[in-house]
């Protein structure tokens, strides 16, 4: 939505109120709100909660997921409303359509979803042949795992979906509690053979975020 179409709201008690600096960046399409940009937020707000974002003058700036780390809010929509399966499906379908247009059959290891670049901040989905790895930047996004996995099974029919974590070191999380796991389907019997421009290699999707090949580094291997 354009800035002109955003409505003023007099009720700011249930919203995150951001300063003018944050508003400028959000108006340009950025997905993040940092702690120092927040004037006030709902009391008792916990990581994973959906919050509305508003400027000091009451303008709606969208909705996001609250966190208590280096990033305070990841914005998932620029209008007022829930962050539900329909929102995720819309972004995911656009990302899938783009990759199907650009990536040829000779490449079976690539990134389906690249976080905020596809409107899904903090979420990455990599393909390794018939297996997928869903990587989250923060535990605050855990509530999206099930709807994302449902959509991936409907759209891509993978043999298995692994969930991995890649938290920012500035968040100072206890990473011992962040387990890489098989979220859906079954695990491969051994290494998985993938191709990149017809060059084959073996990977281990169940090993987590660093499994032997980085899909976003393909140009460096060209």
What residue ranges belong to the model's regions?
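Conserved alpha-helix/loop element of class I SAM-dependent methyltransferases that forms part
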Residues: 48, 210, 215-222
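Short amphipathic alpha-helical segments
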Residues: 84-91, 140-148
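Non-catalytic substrate-recognition/targeting regions of SAM-dependent transferases
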Residues: 113-126, 142-213
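A short interface-forming secondary-structure element
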Residues: 129-142
């Amino acid at each position: 939505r354009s800035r002109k179409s955003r409505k003023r709201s007099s009720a700011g008690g249930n919203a995150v109120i951001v300063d003018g600096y944050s508003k400028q960046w959000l108006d340009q399409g950025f997905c993040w709100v940092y702690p120092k940009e927040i004037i006030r937020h709902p009391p008792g707000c916990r990581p994973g909660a959906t919050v509305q974002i508003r400027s000091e003058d009451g303008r709606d700036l969208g909705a996001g997921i609250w966190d208590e780390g280096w990033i305070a809010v990841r914005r998932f929509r620029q209008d007022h409303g829930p962050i539900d399966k329909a929102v995720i499906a819309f972004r995911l379908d656009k990302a899938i359509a783009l990759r199907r247009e650009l990536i040829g059959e000779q490449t079976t290891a690539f990134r389906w979803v690249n976080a905020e670049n596809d409107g899904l901040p903090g979420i990455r989905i990599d393909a390794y042949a018939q297996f997928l790895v869903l990587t989250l930047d923060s535990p605050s996004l855990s509530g999206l795992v099930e709807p994302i996995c449902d959509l991936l099974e409907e759209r891509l029919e993978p043999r298995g979906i692994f969930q991995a974590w890649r938290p920012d070191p500035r968040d100072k999380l206890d990473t011992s509690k962040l387990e890489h796991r098989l979220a859906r389907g079954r695990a491969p019997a051994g290494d998985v053979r993938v191709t990149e421009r017809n060059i084959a290699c073996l990977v281990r999707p169940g090993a987590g975020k660093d499994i032997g090949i980085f899909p976003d580094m393909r140009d460096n291997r060209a």
